[in-house]
Amino acid sequence: MHDKLYKNILATLVYYDVMDYPMTPFEVWKYLIRSVDKNQGFDEDFMEKEDFSLAKVLAYLEKNDKLKKYIDSKNGYYFLKGRNDLVEKRLEKNKISEKKLGIVLEVARVIRFVPYVRMIAIAGRLATKSAEKNSDLDLLIAVKHGKVFTCRLLVTIIVHLLGKRRHNNKIKDRICLNHFITTKFTISARDMFSSHEYCFLKPIFDNDSFMRFHNSNDWIQNYRPNFSHSSDNISIIKDSRLSRLIRRIGEKTLQSDLIENILGNWQKKKIKNNPKSQTIGGLIISSDEELAFWPNFENQGPAVFEKFQNKLRNLENHNQ
């Protein structure tokens, strides 16, 4: 078990080093990853639930001689040797992210009035507080089952009218509406990178749906056995009588399945004919349960995993 903990602490720090992300001891423990092979499968000996406590992880970080060959620490953050600069970079990105959070909250306060919206969560770089000056702002939006196309259109129109929608070359501080799911909480992409993305989600509207999202996606713990949805992830934006009333009126007005079918057929056709949907290595999901648009997906999840494997292999070979 001790060798497993050593291997998985190292793997965790290497994985996040690829993303230029130094980690606190608590983060190393919470996001501790399992051993994986080249196909993103699991080490057969690591499939059982391991009892790796925060105290054990902290002890290994501070005292394990094997780990000390590879890692260093500064100001409470751990990282690979020679990467001290990541700490200052993370602190700077934290400041940038805090400023961008205000933009997201401003938009989300309006989106909560849109019919069928059930949850709004911050995703991507902003969720990890690693946004850069020119970063866009990713949201995951959950909508009532059976109304994903109606709700997506309404949200897109509203965010565009607010002048905050990302489109064309307008990227910085713009809302990227690239992921919608229904309250069935079906997630198609289930890999190491996706587990990272969903671990860091930050709900800003409707915490009840967020908890149900994690309960419906316990596959995340196959990659992150210590991760669990914590009570400190509370919604920042509360529902109000007015927002509930407007949603209720809108949902009654738009309740016809014919509207959803027409909008669904139109949007599916538009998505299919979009040149970005044909991008090699992209991941485009267009179903009644999930709408996801990642034309550059190959350079995200798969690329991160390949760099992670190569870096981990090089470290192990260098110290043999």
Task: Please give the residue ranges for each predicted region.
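Catalytic core of pol beta-like nucleotidyltransferases
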Residues: 2-134, 143-320
